[in-house]
Amino acid sequence: MADMAKFEEEVNKLRTLEKDREKYFTSRQEMEMRLTESKNVKAELDLMESDSKVYKLIGAVLVRQDLEEARSTVEKRLEFIDSETKRVEASISDISKKCTEQRDKVMNMQKSFQMMAQAAAQAQKK
């Protein structure tokens, strides 16, 4: 029975790792959406003339912003999103490796249980 408790513990570890991996995948999708949105904003800002008026939404109020300041802000946002995406990708890689190792561990335990069950069944036949 101690083996079965250990097995359940390992299965729960695997489930936890898989849930964490899904959170990272969701985070990556959100980053990709933010990146796309920011790239679109940058493209629009790049098309503007230097004397164009730019407004920034703060709460429910539109506030005038300098074009160069807006471009700089978007550029910094793109850099931040890029670094966060790299961090999330590294985390996904790490947790995927851990999931694979844990899945192998659980499968090996299952094989051991099956072999013990077969051995017990064979012993009963004799």
Curated annotation (Swiss-Prot):
Where in or outside the cell is it found? Answer: Cytoplasm
Segments traversing the membrane: none
Q: Name one GO molecular function term.
A: protein-folding chaperone binding
Q: In which tissues is it expressed?
A: Expressed in embryonic blastomeres and gonads.
What Pfam family is a match for this entry? Prefoldin_2
Null allele outcome, as annotated, is: Abnormal locomotion, abnormal morphology, slow growth, defects in distal tip cell migration, defects in developing gonads, and in extreme cases embryonic lethal.
Keywords in alphabetical order, please. Answer: Chaperone, Cytoplasm
**Which InterPro entries does its entry note?**
PFD_beta-like, Prefoldin
Q: List the disulfide bonds.
A: none
Q: Which GO terms describe its cellular component?
A: cytoplasm; prefoldin complex
Principal location listed in the UniProt entry: cytoplasm
The biological processes this protein is annotated with in GO are:
chaperone-mediated protein complex assembly; protein folding
Q: Which family does it belong to?
A: Belongs to the prefoldin subunit beta family.
Spell out the subunit comment: Heterohexamer of two PFD-alpha type and four PFD-beta type subunits.
Its biological function? Answer: Binds specifically to cytosolic chaperonin (c-CPN) and transfers target proteins to it. Binds to nascent polypeptide chain and promotes folding in an environment in which there are many competing pathways for nonnative proteins. Required for positioning of the mitotic spindle.
Q: What is this protein called?
A: Probable prefoldin subunit 6
